[in-house]
């Protein structure tokens, strides 16, 4: 599969070394975009909480390309499951620092390059930004912050022709989540709650992200798009 309108584009994907981010990189490249990966595993490593590292990559992009067409913020973390009253403040801060501040850092570092090309930003939120998950208060609050930040970006950058959207993935098999799905009880419960009845693949999330980043979505901005197999639509059919 390829997405039309991206041949010759330039793109940056934070968290592009694995999981959803890596799937986005593959699809962007198949669609003809020159794609740069900003990840802890790249050389040099890029930590989204380190604004200087992002600024260095942005300077390289400006020197080599003069602008940026697509920014995908897929870098994120998921910490331990704990009820709210047992949640360490450090866990909450760490989730916010990586998931929200990291997204903000990247948007600020690459903002002028996006404005130069009237580009597009797509942030990776979560179904947890729309429907809270039990014992995931830190992650839920952080991804809710990503969704709210996305809407603010859409308003602030519209006058520059820059679009900002987010996807809200449902349960997706990635290196970050694979431990959950090794638990058969959890997997049965999760798939039983998803109307489509299955765990999603990273490539399915990537398809939605790259669509939103492409000219095919030229009139779409400020949207948080659930890609969740129907999780946020409601309960699966009842056996009447």
Q: Where are the regions that the model predicts?
A:
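Active-site loop immediately N-terminal to the catalytic Tyr-X3-Lys motif
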Residues: 84-85, 131-137, 159-160, 197, ...
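Substrate-binding pocket helix/loop in short-chain dehydrogenase/reductase
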Residues: 82-84, 88-93, 190
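Active-site helix of classical SDR
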Residues: 107, 142, 150
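Short C-terminal tail/terminal secondary-structure segment
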Residues: 2, 81, 221-240
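Residue(s) in the substrate-gating loop at a strand-loop-helix junction
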Residues: 126
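Alpha-helical segment proximal to the catalytic Tyr-Lys
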Residues: 112, 155-159, 218
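C-terminal substrate-recognition "lid" of short-chain dehydrogenase/reductases
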Residues: 163, 198-227, 232
């Amino acid at each position: 599969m390829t997405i039309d309108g991206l041949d010759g584009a330039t793109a940056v994907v934070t968290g592009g070394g694995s999981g959803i981010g890596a799937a986005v990189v593959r699809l962007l490249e198949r669609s003809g975009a020159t794609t740069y990966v900003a990840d802890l595993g790249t050389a040099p490593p890029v930590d989204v909480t380190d604004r200087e590292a992002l600024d260095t990559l942005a300077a390289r992009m400006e020197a080599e390309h003069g602008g940026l067409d697509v920014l995908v913020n897929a870098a994120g973390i998921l910490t331990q499951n704990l009820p709210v009253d047992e949640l360490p403040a450090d866990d909450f801060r760490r989730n916010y620092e990586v998931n929200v501040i990291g997204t903000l850092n990247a948007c600020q570092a690459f903002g002028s390059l996006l404005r130069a090309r009237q580009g597009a930003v797509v942030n990776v939120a979560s179904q947890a930004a729309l429907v809270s998950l039990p014992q995931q208060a830190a992650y839920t609050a952080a991804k809710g912050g990503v969704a709210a930040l996305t809407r603010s970006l859409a308003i602030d950058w519209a006058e520059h022709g820059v679009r900002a959207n987010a996807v809200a993935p449902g349960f997706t098999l990635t290196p970050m989540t694979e431990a959950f799905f090794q638990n058969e009880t959890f997997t049965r419960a999760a798939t039983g709650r998803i109307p489509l009845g299955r765990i999603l693949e990273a490539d399915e999330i990537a398809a939605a992200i790259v669509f939103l980043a492409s000219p095919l979505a030229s009139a779409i901005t400020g949207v948080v798009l659930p890609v969740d197999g129907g999780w946020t639509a409601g309960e699966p059919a009842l056996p009447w």
